[in-house]
Amino acid sequence: MSTPKKTYSSTSSAKSKAHSVRVAQTTADAALQAVFEKSGDSGDSFDYSKSVSKSTAESLPSGAVTAYLQRMQRGGLTQSFGCMIAVEGTGFRVIAYSENAPEILDLVPQAVPSVGEMDTLRIGTDVRTLFTASSVASLEKAAEAQEMSLLNPITVNCRRSGKQLYAIAHRIDIGIVIDFEAVKTDDHLVSAAGALQSHKLAAKAITRLQALPGGDIGLLCDTVVEEVRELTGYDRVMAYRFHEDEHGEVVAEIRRADLEPYLGLHYPGTDIPQASRFLFMKNKVRIIADCSAPPVKVIQDPTLRQPVSLAGSTLRSPHGCHAQYMGNMGSIASLVMAVIINDNEEDSHGSVQRGRKLWGLVVCHHTSPRTVPFPLRSACGFLMQVFGLQLNMEVELAAQLREKHILRTQTLLCDMLLRDAPIGIVSQIPNIMDLVKCDGAALYYGKRFWLLGTTPTESQIKDIAEWLLEYHKDSTGLSTDSLADANYPAAHLLGDAVCGMAAAKITAKDFLFWFRSHTAKEIKWGGAKHDPGEKDDGRKMHPRSSFKAFLEVVKRRSLPWEDVEMDAIHSLQLILRGSFQDIDDSDTKTMIHARLNDLKLHDMDELSVVANEMVRLIETATAPILAVDSNGMINGWNAKIAQVTGLPVSEAMGRSLVKDLVTDESVAVVERLLYLALRGEEEQNVEIKLKTFGTQTEKGVVILIVNACSSRDVSENVVGVCFVGQDVTGQKMFMDKFTRIQGDYKTIVQNPHPLIPPIFGADEFGYCFEWNPAMEGLTGWKKDEVVGKLLVGEIFGMQMMCCRMKSQDAMTKFMIALNTAMDGQSTDKFTFSFFDREGKYVDVLLSTNKRTNADGVITGVFCFLQIASSELQQALKVQRATEKVAVAKLKELAYIRQEIKNPLCGITFTRQLLEDTDLSDDQQQFLDTSAVCEQQLQKVLNDMDLESIEDGYLELDTAEFEMGTVMNAVISQGMTTSREKGLQIFRETPREINTMRLLGDQIRLQQVLSDFLLNTVRFTPSPEGWVKIKVVPTRKRLGGSVHVVHLEFRVSHPGAGLPEELVLEMYDRGKGMTQEGLGLNMCRKLVRLMNGDVHYVREAMQCYFVVNVELPMAQRDDASSQM
């Protein structure tokens, strides 16, 4: 059930909200199951649609819910296509088995055992006595493994008959459960235990999946269902996606032509209970061979306290409710695979916790009994892992798009506030309906109404506002997908047109509203339409009755309000509420400073220290580092790169990287690196080859693995590229020689020479056969401790393996790389990380190559590791720290830019109020000066694209203005600082300047003159100092009545003047760029855009800026304008 949210939150509340939804859904699941079981006992029919609606409103005692969950996991029944035996964790003593186990295992019936017969199965039997010696060895090895699932399936043979079976083992709380399935002659037989062998079956599907372009989840889902159907042969394969409210949707489907389509079907959350979803997280591939077959009872040790858990068993029997559902839709067999992705949530401390969540399911249905062998099911499960990886990337891409949406929304909010707030946000375009997806919106302000789209009537909105003030008076707003569930008394009067609402309080009695219609309006089902003569039986469990039940559940409910939408609404609310406060409110200032402190930004001194440390590291690093400017010319060449190439620093500087220094085969690679890096796209782990010079020439080329880093100035403009490299020449030579050797490779692999990289290998069955000395040194594990173990599952894995990996995604990527090599395709420089024997985190690059025999047949895989030097790691660490500081500074700038706009709106509003009063001439002049200063501030705040100023293609405004107004505004901006320093500002301008009307960009002219004036004031000695601004106009006739005015502005002051470095920064010749230097630099470029120029002159007694611009005079009809 939906509950209203009284305050707005973002991702920090998502986890608790999702938990609440799941708890409520579990209760509904239990209630629905209770109704089903009760109807079966009494003989009454089970009305599915009505029961679903009723279950969502019922509450059950916690004991009843717990009992329901226990039955789901410990039902005591299995399917008949295999058998189950549970044994103790040590000793293999049988504690439970399915009744059909003797038959499946070809044992003598228990009722008439022969004298001395060992092949009997009962509680207490040692299960090892039932299988051959080699089978027992395999089972014992699996029992010792930490990650047992990666060893499945284990091929075993019955001792008596020799019958071959797949054993699928997993651990439970009291021991080990082993499922046995017969190996059929037409099965995809794997010749050894382990997941790696099974995964080969999905190689083609994985290759196709990885080749898909990004940004299209629909195409990804369509491809997955196609590949799964080709692998398994089921009549129908669908991809289900779970929505935030736990209901599901069919987003992709491939089916037999005569079957009814279900694409687009939405179904209530109870169709796949929470308990089942939990089981899918544990057992990710679930098969039902024949839902009509009678289940098999499990016999267990009577001393056990509760039924054996079958949560992870491949044979767990379907519950009656689900079996009936399948039968009603004409499906006899099914295969369901979990699609699991990362789930990043912020905890209460603000740190990100990475978990896993069920995104959806890939479901296969068949109209007749069907059993898919375990190796193929395992391959499908691995395909789902790859699918989950692809989905993770798509989700991250969607998150980036969401970030862009937030930025666009913030721009929209600022645009709204430049108007007549708050009326402008509903009376102009765009308006508040463009802020979030809705069917209607309203502003209730000062007992007046502004309505947009589909909304309640004015009287109904007033009633909602009064209800909010009475029942939610302590909240800043309310959002709900159901006004009825939020207990609004008159919700029934609003109809289907208004179900969901988000309300934001902007004053003590005024509100903004957004409204949404019922969800059913948004739902479209692509299924076949009913014949008018047919009647649905909504009482039966069937996809159509599920759809009907879903529509019944959501008929008075809208789509939920997403967190990003509530953040946008909350932002607008805060800004609007702030616009009704005094702009000098000290609380606002306190809030701004507190926010800045929370960002924990480094100051400029700390940034300088980091930068200096970075330079020192680059110059002294034993890693080769080089840098180029935007034209590709060398402007950085450290001692290490000079050493390995034989080219001294003095000879390298100024040479072209592409034309002079890289080999011909690397030209295209380096050109691409430069092109991308100069656009801000940084590539990593790219191999390039450099020429050698002098004494190094005889050694041949230098091979580097480089990371390309964009070099930026303080304005975040890319001005060059830095390459941080690792010299792998020696390792590459050995690797090339190694892969060319046809016979004995031991002399290379086992050579302890430091240039030999860490190397390990696995045979075609996934067992480690090579682990060289460098690998021993890197991991801490000796060769004799790992050889013979499964590479994935015993050496590398998620649990207490020899080399534990950090995440499931990392292990999946490793397995993909191994499978790719087994398929004959090498993987080069793949990022690979694990924990060594001492628990130290190791971060390396992995390259894989196929291993072949003399006939060219692939017999395994070789893996080579490349380790980054400590100097390179430190240099990259400092680089990341510098980038982090830069990002933090940008966040601070963006925040300040946003917060300045709010009080600026208040200033504008106050000035507009004053303009409507009776003012003297002096007062009117003050207001005019204030107005143009506001315009200047607004212009600067909107300067998001400094690059256009630097490159000289910024479009200047052209409008008529009065020069006297400009001078008043310029001088007013310098008055506060000059008074603080005890300086006087003298203004020397001809009288005609005050009334001279010109054409041009008034605000930009005002901006540059005020910047030059303020810098002059800052560097004038005080007290008793002075600053003088002088204007000399010269009129010119261009022909006819067209005149231009050449204006020379001279801003002078006594003393030593501006620091020389600051003046150099103005001319782009400084070593760095300070904030003051950046301002002067931008102003000089703005002057040049006006076809003017600026100089700074030093004389014996004074220094001064000289600014020359030429502007056309405005055409006047009166005679005074004529020469």
From Swiss-Prot:
Protein name: Phytochrome 1
Pfam families: GAF, HATPase_c, HisKA, PAS, PAS_2, PHY
Low complexity bias locations: 1-15
Domain PAS, chain residue ranges per copy: 610-681, 744-815
Sorted UniProt keywords: Chromophore, Cytoplasm, Photoreceptor protein, Receptor, Repeat, Sensory transduction, Transcription, Transcription regulation
Domain GAF span(s) in chain numbering: 216-395
Residues annotated as domain Histidine kinase: 895-1115
Transmembrane segments: none
Lineage, uppermost ranks: Eukaryota, Viridiplantae, Streptophyta, Embryophyta, Bryophyta
Species this chain originates from: Physcomitrium patens (Spreading-leaved earth moss)
Protein's GO biological process: chloroplast avoidance movement; detection of visible light; red, far-red light phototransduction; regulation of DNA-templated transcription
PROSITE patterns the UniProt entry points to: HIS_KIN, PAS, PHYTOCHROME_1, PHYTOCHROME_2
Reported modifications of this chain: Contains one covalently linked phytochromobilin chromophore.
